[in-house]
């Protein structure tokens, strides 16, 4: 019999952080020296926001390269030498047949439009159907209020096809706040009927006049680049100052949604899994690989509508100077009765499995067999020759990241492995230890057991390896410290403060969060076997206020909105959460403050 066990330590966090750690001087320098190691759209976002803070000398350098400092938003000028255009739906495509910006004049169908432009036109027609008809996004703000037709000045969204700097596939440039011809309408996307934006922006898009020097099939490059970049224009129609990592992660998600067969997004996965110790929102470059987080959510936990809901929620947060991307994501998930902490933890579990088996349940990646990597990079490997008791003190871990430790249990005489989290829950931090048992060659091959507890004892007599995955969340810091110990035992006799817990009977009720609370509180619990579980909320006098039932295996959560079973809000005070089965009961106190 062969198993693999994976364990996770998880901590919770939602503090807004600085909107960008990349300085405007660094962004400007990348333009000046032609450095392409950062996506051009992110460089333009930083200059658009902070460009007026640059020194006169650097401003002059950028002006010489076509940047306009006359508006509140600093932007590059639109090309002025493209003498042809073709309209398709809401789009207008600008191009030329002469000079360095010329597209190939080949016109096989003799329709008067070059085949290269025809391909782009058809691509955008398909993109528009998915973005606006199927997914119901609001179209980007128009520039019809511009006085100069050469700068747009129509109701069409402008796409310019010309010779870009070496290495750039395409980009979207924010120019001005939507409807900035009036202080009353400034920042409001005129195409959103039921909402009023404050930071929506007019943009234009740039694509190359050819992709001859790029590896890959040109038509596929055009498709994924167009889907990705145009979604930036859509995003800017909600909040142009949203965090770069979130913009890029969801734009990569969108290109995969449009062109799932191309899988250009796979290029970002290897680095993402090679650096699990970096937060999913670490920086904009990390954001490209973080698309897999949203793929996990929409494949397993929620419909594709989540992506739209995120940007609808982004209207509520002014992210100009402060990164509110996590609160935005939390709010969007809550609209689907999903808890950010729970589903993010589930995401880390899924990364530890990387399985396309139906038995993986909500931790499944349907395309995992084609992913270009295996499990995330290991932080450390522990073997039979390691000490019997190992302590890990003051281990640093970035929020929204994970550390993976492998315990090799082959060729050893010890039978039990104890995982003991020494760092306890606090008002600022939450901790979880989750284990995954993968059955390979026993009576239930290709199945998994998933369970959670802060102290776990695992029978490893027939187990090949154990992987600990430590991940972190916290209130007021982007780093966390944790301590734990690992004990190897050759018998079932453990230390006095330990308990041997059969893997099939390990229930847990974790501390509800946040506590105290004033609107909603999330209650996390683990069910390791098929058995009805009753979760009830009582007042301090023992009266049952609300009851929940669950039979779903694994780590689960419910959100209580402070109302009784009749939907009537309860008063402030102390309440008791009780989880019980035929063989298990545990309670937690919670405090409702209004």
Segments predicted by a language model, with ranges:
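Sec-dependent N-terminal signal peptides
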Residues: 4-13
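Zn2+-dependent metallopeptidase catalytic core
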Residues: 21-202, 208-230, 234-238, 432-437
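Acidic/His/Gly-enriched intrinsically disordered linker/tail segments
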Residues: 185-200, 220-224, 239-301, 305, ...
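Beta/coil-rich, acidic/histidine-enriched accessory regions frequently appended to metallopeptidases
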Residues: 317-498
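Aromatic/hydrophobic beta-strand junction motif of beta-rich domains
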Residues: 419-423, 521-527, 560
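Surface-exposed, proline-anchored Ser/Thr-rich loop/turn motifs
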Residues: 495-526, 538-543, 572, 591-594
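Short, surface-exposed loop/turn motifs with a glycine/proline- and acidic-biased composition
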Residues: 522, 549-583
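Extracellular and select intracellular beta-sandwich modules with Ser/Thr-enriched
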Residues: 584-588
